[in-house]
Amino acid sequence: MKHLIPIIIGLLALVGFADSVYLTLAHFRVIDPITLESSGVCSLTVGSCMKVILSPKATVAGIPHAVLGAAYFAVLLGAATIRMMIGRWFAPFEMFAFLLAGFAFSAYLTQELVLRMHAPCPFCLTAHAINAFVLALYAISIQP
């Protein structure tokens, strides 16, 4: 089972990366936010996708959260690939710290989405859920 975990983490990282890139494109209006809002996924929570993407809280120091997510998931994909190539996690402590920091940021953003903005954006919550699963899988994979 442990040899499958890096593959699963890599696949989850790909999904998270695609999700974050999609949200980045919507943030920069390469994808029309109206099109995003009318998608089947965003129509489940009327108005939440637009509210989140257009919110001034959707950035940190001018960098959209989705861009940070894309970079985060790209690093995860690279780490999973290296793990599959060399048979062990490269810098396991640093990787755990990186994942823990990402999880903490995701927990904060989820709290903001649900409790403060009252906008449970399905695309955002998907990235946050993936983050939690990856942390759990990584913790399992580093056990002796």
Could you describe each region identified by the protein language model?
Residues 2-144:
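Membrane-interfacial helix-loop segments of redox and metal-homeostasis proteins
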